[in-house]
């Protein structure tokens, strides 16, 4: 940030709406950026768009690169561990982003309360998530907003 100020530049952050809503920002990374270009875009939409762009480049190098990005678990780690595996997977800690993004949308857009969120989630995701997981994730997102 000091360097950006010295040369009249900006520190661009890559954090998205999902991370900001959950308070899951990297300190002195996304958290300290001067301009967050993705802050109004949920993580599930980012992934969808990357997948869409990838589909436009079938059989080309860009498709392989973008699919590798999609296949890599979401993680704040910038480098792999010694055995080339990512140890800290964000969704193992905060839960599925597709649920959080669903909750954020329905809470902000429609003002849904926990009971209604639960019912809509059961309808939207059918049997993908069990009752306890949904309740746990609804509680998690509500605590993030308190």
Where are these regions (language model features)?
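ATP/NTP-dependent adenylation/nucleotidyl-transfer catalytic domains that generate, transfer
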Residues: 1-146
């Amino acid at each position: 940030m000091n360097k950006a100020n010295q040369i009249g530049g900006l520190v661009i952050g890559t954090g998205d709406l999902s991370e900001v809503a959950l308070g899951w920002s990297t300190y002195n990374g996304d958290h300290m950026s001067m301009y967050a270009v993705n802050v109004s875009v949920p993580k599930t939409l980012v992934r969808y768009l990357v997948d869409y762009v990838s589909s436009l480049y079938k059989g080309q190098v860009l498709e392989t690169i973008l699919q590798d990005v999609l296949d890599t678990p979401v993680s704040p780690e910038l480098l792999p561990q010694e055995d080339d595996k990512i140890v800290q997977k964000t969704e193992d800690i905060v839960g599925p982003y597709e649920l959080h993004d669903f909750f954020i949308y329905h809470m902000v857009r429609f003002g849904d309360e926990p009971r209604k969120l639960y019912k809509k989630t059961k309808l939207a995701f059918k049997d993908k998530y069990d009752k306890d997981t949904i309740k746990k994730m609804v509680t998690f997102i509500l605590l993030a907003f308190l």
